[in-house]
Amino acid sequence: MKDTLFNKSLNKRFCFDEKVAHVFDDMLERSIPYYHEMLNLGAYFIAQNLKENIHPKPLPKPLIYDLGCSTGNFFIALNQQIQQDIELVGIDNSMPMLKKAQEKLKDFNNVRFECMDFLEVEFKEASAFSLLFVLQFVRPMQREVLLKKIYNSLALNGVLLVGEKIMSEDRILDKQMIELYYLYKQNQGYSHNEIAFKREALENVLVPYSLKENVALLESVGFKHVEAVFKWVNFTLLVARKT
């Protein structure tokens, strides 16, 4: 379904409710440059990590968490690239999103969804975690706590994927990057009003960090190897490995 949610001002802060869930896939594809390429790239690194079996004590059945899994797109990408027996757990606090995900992945028997606040979940030991365009919605004070919890739950040599919208630390460059991104959205069919109304709804809800800040945050919780494997203007995909 086409995203026309912001044809008029919502007069409220953005939230992942039923109206958003209905158009969310279209919103992602038209709002995140190279969205599917980043999903496939992230799935590749997790698949390679499992295939090369570089864990000192591999888990009997690799467990992968997708936090803020929304409509389950990343699990489709993972199942296309991973041949071995795995367990996929998607966690999201939006039931409308999870209903879409369950419908989309009903034919996969290795997927389980939980409607919970992932900040309150006690994770099992896992081979990989993904936070794809999710950390930017977590309150800044809680980000380090969440990442530390993920780090502690990762198996040795496990990986964390972090996809984020980012900002520049240079004021002029940041303005130019935002302007280019708005041009991108216009080319995807969004009007000036839709762009402005969405920006208004996301104010103080989506809080981006710079690339340097995100890397520093990951390093501060223990990750010694953090790589930006993809970047387009103000979007990036990071792979962090626990060693």
UniProtKB/Swiss-Prot annotation:
Pfam families in the record: Methyltransf_25
Reactions the enzyme catalyzes: prephenate + S-adenosyl-L-methionine = carboxy-S-adenosyl-L-methionine + 3-phenylpyruvate + H2O
Keywords assigned by UniProt, alphabetized: S-adenosyl-L-methionine, Transferase
Keyword Transferase: yes
Binding site for S-adenosyl-L-methionine: 35, 68-70, 92-93, 199
Catalytic activity, EC: 2.1.3.-
Disulfide partners: none
Entries under CDD domains matching the protein: AdoMet_MTases (cd02440)
GO MF annotation terms: carboxyl- or carbamoyltransferase activity; S-adenosyl-L-methionine binding
Positions in coiled-coil regions: none
BP GO annotations: tRNA wobble uridine modification
Subunit structure comment from the entry: Homodimer.
HAMAP family found in the cross-reference section: Cx_SAM_synthase (MF_01589)
Function text: Catalyzes the conversion of S-adenosyl-L-methionine (SAM) to carboxy-S-adenosyl-L-methionine (Cx-SAM).
Full protein name: Carboxy-S-adenosyl-L-methionine synthase
Gene: cmoA
